[in-house]
Amino acid sequence: MPRPIQATIHTAALQQNLARARAAAPDARVWAVVKANAYGHGIERAFEGLRGADGFALLDLGEAERVRQLGWRGPILLLEGVFEPRDLELCSRLSLWHAVHCDEQIDWLSAHKTHAPHRVFLKMNSGMNRLGFPPARYRAAWARLNALPQVDEISFMTHFSDADGPRGIAHQIDAFCTATQDLPGERTVSNSAATLRHAGGDARVRGDWVRAGIVLYGSAADHPEHTAAHWGLAPTMTLSARIIGTQQLQAGDTVGYGSSFTADRPMTIGVVACGYADGYPRHAPTGTPVLVNGVRTRTVGRVSMDMITVDLTPLHEAGVEAGVGSEATLWGRASCGAVLCIDEVAQAAGTVGYELMCALAPRVPVVVD
């Protein structure tokens, strides 16, 4: 039989989270961000749950081609624009909208021969200092684009660095609005955190489009200040495996490589068929939460390439049977309906839910429900 591990993508949860993003930004259209292969979910697997969006935003032409092959005829936005001049031809052929964030991209457009003018999103560096024109140069970049016959329509975009934290977005939205004042065109500024935390009461933050990313996949961008449940989000990916062995420990016995865990009393542990080669974080410490048969317990010892060890004592003390064949939910929704949010696992491992989703290994079988 196949190794007993599986990831499940939940279509209804994707639909629920998309509806939640839309409700948080009334009157704005929603980009479903599917970069990084839909945050590890798989573009093809996530498409049915996200096809109610107004457009798809992604990174490269390969992802754009895949979305078109799925039958999508609506807007597609390249969030980082094109990477070389010849990409513009495929943008024309696939009717892609694309960001413009540097002078070189404007140069490529000006030299491009096309019969289908381009829809571009001029990106401002309003304070994050990654991509985009700084406010002092933004209008000059707009003027260059506006003079090009290759450009049909110019929209405006920026990206917030601190929408999920106490610093907030005021300094960036003010800079953006000042630089774009009176310029004609649509605006998109909000990522997931800004959409949930700031868009409801400020039309400037809602803009014409919001870019829903991690919110679609059931993770809270501002965890642990707020949980996914607080925002009404449902888990869209479940990683589950089976217990393939058990051991009875006595006080003083150690577990795993490096003997990093020592039992302080008699206890039962289960060996789960999941390890860092499956995408589970190797640096997750003892105490990282896990569900066994829907009951919350913890990992013990180091994560191995193919196995994790978990404490079964709390289940036995509660009168819940657990042993070989029992279900272990590493994150997501257990068969009984109990939920372990991916953000909790990520926090214990010192990372974020985004990384765990994107790290799901190719060897893990994936099903869609």
Curated annotation (Swiss-Prot):
Family according to the record: Belongs to the alanine racemase family.
One biological process term in Gene Ontology: D-alanine biosynthetic process
PROSITE patterns, alphabetized: ALANINE_RACEMASE
EC number of this enzyme: 5.1.1.1
Record-level Gene Ontology MF annotations: alanine racemase activity; pyridoxal phosphate binding
Cofactor(s) needed by this chain: pyridoxal 5'-phosphate
Gene Ontology CC: cytosol
Keywords, in A-Z order: Isomerase, Pyridoxal phosphate
Protein source organism: Paracidovorax citrulli (strain AAC00-1) (Acidovorax citrulli)
Pathway listed: Amino-acid biosynthesis; D-alanine biosynthesis; D-alanine from L-alanine: step 1/1
Gene3D superfamilies, A to Z: Alanine racemase (3.20.20.10), Lyase, Ornithine Decarboxylase, Chain A, domain 1 (2.40.37.10)
Alphabetical list of PANTHER family matching this protein: ALANINE RACEMASE, ALANINE RACEMASE, CATABOLIC-RELATED
Name of protein: Alanine racemase
The reaction(s) this protein catalyses: L-alanine = D-alanine
SMART domains named in the record: Ala_racemase_C (SM01005)
Pfam family, one: Ala_racemase_N
Binding site for substrate: 130, 305
N6-(pyridoxal phosphate)lysine modifications at: 35
Residues annotated as the enzyme's active site: 35, 257
Function: Catalyzes the interconversion of L-alanine and D-alanine. May also act on other amino acids.
